[in-house]
Amino acid sequence: MRYRSDRVKIAIDVMGGDRAPDEILKGALLASKEVEGEIVLIGPEEIVRNKGLPFVSAFEIVKMDDPPLEVLRKKNSSMHVGLKLLSEGKVDAFVSAGATGPLFLGATSIVGKLEGIERPALGVAVPSLKGATVLIDAGANAKVRPEHLVDFAFMGIAYSKVLGAENPRVGLLNMGSEENKGPDDIKRAYQLLKEFLGDTFFGNIEGHDINLGTVDVVVADGFSGNVALKTMEGTAKLVTSVLKESIKDGGFLSLLGALLMKRSFDKMKEKLDPRSYGGTFILGVKGIVVKAHGSSDAKAIKHAIKVAEKGIRMNIVQEIERGISHVRNSGDGR
């Protein structure tokens, strides 16, 4: 796997997200201190100028409640301009906390789909006991055909290899581990994954397996994947909140113990904090597009930009192209 070591250029949609533009600008400034390259601000000139970072003016806004087609209609919006810059090779990646529908449509229409990919998908690396598990689709395609789930598996395998997995194993998210569980489309997807992936396919997995690291890649339709992701985010917040309350209510000894274990607690909190893995790749398009959570604060935006940088340096688009081409042409598991 080739690693890019040169300076990168990442564009950020300053007007995308519930907390735009203030938190987006703060996050971009934080990221600029850690990323080896340029962060390019895209938004209305009166908002993005004099921030100490390069900028591109875009006076229109794709709002969070806008229908998907608005990204194509509003050609002077920060989202459209950013995707256009990416498609023209003027930036290496584009990050937005804007609405998923417009961003996804814009990525597939303006940046374009990779050859052989009918449905791009959202892929996110979530924390697990064994490091990270790739969840795909995390919310782009509510309804899919079984064949689309096979494409998701190929893309997820490539992403998992970028994260360091040597021989990623794939699981199909279902309501039970038995082969005959689930609706007909899931049963059909099971058979296709078994046929195309061979021993790489682990079989059905359940929601609790995602964070246990039972497999390296979890394949799901966008509805189920998004529910799983949001549930994990809520659980992470619950765990940290309960831990804080327990320490607070436990008296002096609990506080003393917490002080002695502060470094361990901080590491746990960082790993569980959804903001720490705050970016989701739109996989299957010809450029690196990262979707940040709509409610992202500065910390989450910083991490989303760093996710984009990692995707650039690990050549994730080329790895997906190579992985899909190799698996499909080799005949392995067919």
From Swiss-Prot:
GO cellular component: cytoplasm
Catalytic activity: a fatty acyl-[ACP] + phosphate = an acyl phosphate + holo-[ACP]
Compartmental location: Cytoplasm
Top-rank taxon: Bacteria
Any GO BP: fatty acid biosynthetic process
Entry keyword annotation includes Cytoplasm: yes
Main localization of the protein described in the UniProt heading: cytoplasm
Keywords: Cytoplasm, Lipid biosynthesis, Lipid metabolism, Phospholipid biosynthesis, Phospholipid metabolism, Transferase
InterPro entries: FA_synthesis (IPR003664), Phospholipid_synth_PlsX-like (IPR012281)
A GO term for molecular function: phosphate:acyl-[acyl carrier protein] acyltransferase activity
Known EC number: 2.3.1.274
Enzyme class, broadest EC rank: transferase
Pathway stated in the Swiss-Prot or TrEMBL entry: Lipid metabolism; phospholipid metabolism
Family: Belongs to the PlsX family.
Role noted for this protein: Catalyzes the reversible formation of acyl-phosphate (acyl-PO(4)) from acyl-[acyl-carrier-protein] (acyl-ACP). This enzyme utilizes acyl-ACP as fatty acyl donor, but not acyl-CoA.
Quaternary structure and interacting proteins, as annotated: Homodimer. Probably interacts with PlsY.
Protein name in the entry: Phosphate acyltransferase
